[in-house]
């Protein structure tokens, strides 16, 4: 996701402008002018920092917008650095990547990007957050598979997107099952315990897969296309919002891609669960509108081998002229037309996947 700024309502009815930085491996919140803050259980934001071990350290000073600051705040901020150090950002992202990707720092690649391909999609609900949209299985199956999908202003399905971008080389079929009811509340899976990542997010995938198997909704062997004993990929749409959306609950899960390598319970039906990706049911941070194809096409891009092209440490807010912005789905393009119309893959992205052979200029 791109860094985003929004107004957060506080318990006393006042509002604070906050800015969200980072990605699934490392994210943090600042004031509008760049000082790191974090919300305590009382609902208010306090100035904070990360210790060398990545744990969050709060001050006792509540944060306000620059024009409303107290003398105590102003004096403290005069000797306080903005944001986080580049070393902390780099180290924390590496730790987060190591945990989410099971120690593999390389870009994930779980699916061979050619031919017809069945991909498993599981819809999952939390104990305290259920699906809001009606007929979720049918709704998601249509959004992912129906040629020319046009609900809610959409301009095509996810399958359309990949067929078009690959020039017909890759034709995915998304097999949707569920919803299944997870054993824990949303906050268990989405809790941010350190600067690095949500430690229980991968367990959400394991739980969803185990329940789907127990209920007879899926035979995981059917999703091992090359018979190597490893499921090609699992995609989970979880109920509610994405933490990456400006203003969404901080205990929500951040949409991401990773691996279940080495996790307990990752062998089902005699095959191993490995690469996965996940994102939310709803778009934005309020309302009950179903997401568009932008986020799944972004996260599935990781499954095909693509890296993020947006600013991930948040130091400069992602406003570098070197980045693709809305012209790349691996940058800010997944949000084009409210997530309904992601841009075509760039030449660089198609070359990375293998759908295009770049011509070397002499």
Positions of PLM-derived features:
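Zymogen propeptides/activation segments of proteases
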Residues: 1-271, 275
């Amino acid at each position: 996701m791109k860094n985003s700024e929004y107004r957060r309502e506080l318990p006393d009815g006042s509002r604070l402008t906050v800015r969200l930085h980072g990605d699934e491996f490392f994210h943090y919140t600042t004031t509008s002018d760049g000082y790191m803050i974090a919300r305590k259980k009382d609902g208010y934001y306090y100035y904070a920092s990360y210790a060398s071990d990545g744990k969050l350290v709060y001050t006792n000073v509540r944060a306000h917008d620059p024009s409303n600051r107290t003398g105590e705040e102003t004096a403290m901020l005069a000797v306080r650095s903005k944001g986080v150090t580049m070393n902390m950002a780099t180290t924390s992202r590496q730790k987060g990547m190591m945990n989410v990707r099971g120690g593999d720092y390389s870009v994930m690649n779980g699916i061979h990007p050619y031919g017809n391909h069945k991909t498993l999609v599981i819809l999952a609900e939390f104990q305290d957050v259920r699906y809001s949209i009606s007929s979720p299985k049918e709704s998601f199956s249509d959004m992912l598979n129906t040629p020319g999908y046009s609900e809610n202003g959409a301009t095509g399905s996810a399958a359309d997107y990949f067929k078009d971008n690959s020039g017909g080389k890759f034709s995915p079929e998304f097999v949707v099952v569920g919803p299944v009811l997870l054993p824990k509340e949303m906050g268990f899976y989405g809790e941010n315990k350190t600067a690095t990542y949500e430690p229980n997010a991968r367990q959400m995938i394991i739980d969803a897969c185990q329940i789907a198997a127990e209920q007879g909704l899926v035979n995981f062997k059917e999703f091992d296309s090359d018979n190597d004993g490893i499921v090609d990929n699992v995609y989970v749409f979880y109920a509610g919002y994405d933490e990456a959306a400006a203003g969404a609950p901080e205990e929500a899960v951040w949409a991401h891609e990773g691996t279940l390598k080495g996790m307990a319970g990752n062998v089902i039906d005699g095959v191993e669960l490995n690469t996965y990706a996940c994102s939310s049911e709803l778009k934005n941070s309020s309302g009950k509108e179903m997401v568009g194809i932008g986020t799944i096409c972004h996260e599935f891009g990781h499954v095909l081998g693509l890296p993020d092209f947006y600013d991930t440490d948040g130091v400069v807010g992602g406003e570098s002229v070197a980045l693709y912005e809305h012209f790349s789905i691996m940058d800010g393009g997944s949000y084009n037309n409210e997530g309904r119309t992601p841009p075509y893959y760039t030449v660089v992205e198609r070359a990375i996947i293998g759908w295009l052979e770049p011509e070397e200029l002499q």
